[in-house]
Amino acid sequence: MIFVLLLGAFAVTSCSGRRQELDAALSAAGSNRPELEKVLAHYRSDPDRRKLKAAEYLISGMSGHYGLVPSPGLDSVKAVLADLYARRKVDSARLEQWRHFRPDNLKKAYDIETITADYLIRNIDMAFEDWDCRSWNRHLDFGEFCELLLPYRVGDEPLEDWRTEYREHFRYITDSVYTGSDPVELVNTVFDTIIDSLFRYNVDFALPSLGGLWLMRNRIGGCRESCDFAVYLLRSIGVPVATDCYFHGSTHTWNVVLDTTGRYEPFWMDKFTGSRAVRGRDDGRVKGKVYRWNYGMSGRSEDRTPRYIDVTSDYFGPNAARVRISRECRGGPVYLGFFQYRELIPQTAVNVHAGHAEFRDIEPGVAFVPISGNGRIAGSPFYIDDSGETVLLEPDLSHSEDATADRKTRATPWLQKTMDNCEGALIEGSSTPDFPEPVPLGVCGKPRINYNYIYPSSTKPVRYVRFTPREPLRMELGELRLFRDKERQDTIDVVLHSYSEPNRNDALAGNAIDGDELTYYEGRPGPSFLVLDLGREEHVRCIEWVPRNDDNFIRYGDTYELQYLDGVRGWRTVEGSRVTARDTVLHFSGVPGDALLRLHDMTRGVEEGVFIVEDGGQRFL
């Protein structure tokens, strides 16, 4: 792996430095320099000197910002997404045709060479209107204004007049729905007001920034698209917001609003998995390190866009961990390694002093390990505890303990919320498909694991079995299996009879009986059902139901082994730990004390989190 994730920030510390940046930007503009000079001349005659400073800020930081030029391929992908948004499904061949589209080869139109004076002036004037006229912005200083309200773009989208369009479309919210002065409450009012038209989650394609005008009409995409939409909307009505993210494995983004208290409060405007802004609370995801997209900061790539700053301390406060580095790795910088499944993802780089490295501002309760530039483990794994102390995880082979394990990775709040959609679901039988007198077979309890069982008390044979989620919960069912015996040795073969319409092309009803516990059937919002045909009347004595899940619980028949990290010597297998699962909980003995562990599935999958033994069970870090 080539480690290129060097995230940092620079600050302009003098007027001469800002002047040099401005001169450099004007020189880089080439034939477009007159447009930028026109902006500066316009504001030199404006009595509000802040506007000239804002113009200088935007122009000074403009180098490296660009929009990707639309292409026939990108237009085709956007057309497929628009159809998915409008009709919820699209021809699978058409979907597959564009699934492998990549935006990497799209041409770039650099702002410094193409932006017009009229566009920039209109953007600056509208941003200042919102700074000066919105009561919740009285606390904003100039630097916060420049990053949270002023920017004319959010990514690599084409330049367009999104601010005017969004203000006209959504100003009714601040005109009549919410007229207070609390930005957090305003964000939640927007969330509640437009929730029925919020984002439909779709990550079928690799996408560049799609632009505010397209997202206004087509609210579909992944977390980045929903965050872009939220920034366009909220900045257009004067709310100071930004986009935060983490970089490990699958990158996730969300939004933050600057409260009048000076705190940044997280939220995410997604219809089903989103979250309102709640002071002092985030979404519970493990972050490790957190970064914020800024217009005027140095970036991770050669052309300095997109640009990120480290804001981890906004979430967890300041802290530091000082750890010893092996002699072989002291010749250069070392990286903060984040455990992402079987890889170590570098988060930030520090220099080694007196044989030690000090990593600042990291999430407490999360395991890290120092690594060299070529990915070599450079020291012992560690974490910061709740008191701010650094805890080293060095295996004690002279002291062993017993341990149980029921998962490969930590259970996230999203996972539990998804599984809970099965809680209270009603399972009924009937001799006919219209269920005139349904036979109660059971009700699903609150799922804590993947495999769940119901043993019907009814002795009446049935030919059809119906699964109905409890309203207002939605259908999210991984598997439904029926048995003639309580020991689950005699499976009843079933076929689909009828079902409510699926919500997505890849979440069809057949997934609930395909034998693959990672696929699932997802119904549309509102009442839904699934009816299975047993072919003939049968006595159903056991029902196995599997909620939609991440397939990281213990899986019957898979072979596992327990491993521990022995510092720079790498991962080692706990002696005698290899076992084939016959239950949903695995039991191990002879586990080294104080060790960082992982449960390795030798049969399938790559998602394996790290944990320690606590009270005989797993505590994921």
Predicted regions and their residues:
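A short, amphipathic beta-strand motif
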Residues: P318-E328, A411-T412
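Short Pro-Gly-centered beta-turn/loop motif in secreted/extracellular proteins
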Residues: H356-A367, G373-G375, T459-P461, G590-G593
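Structured interaction patches on ligand/partner-binding surfaces of diverse proteins
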Residues: N374-S400, L482, G609-L621
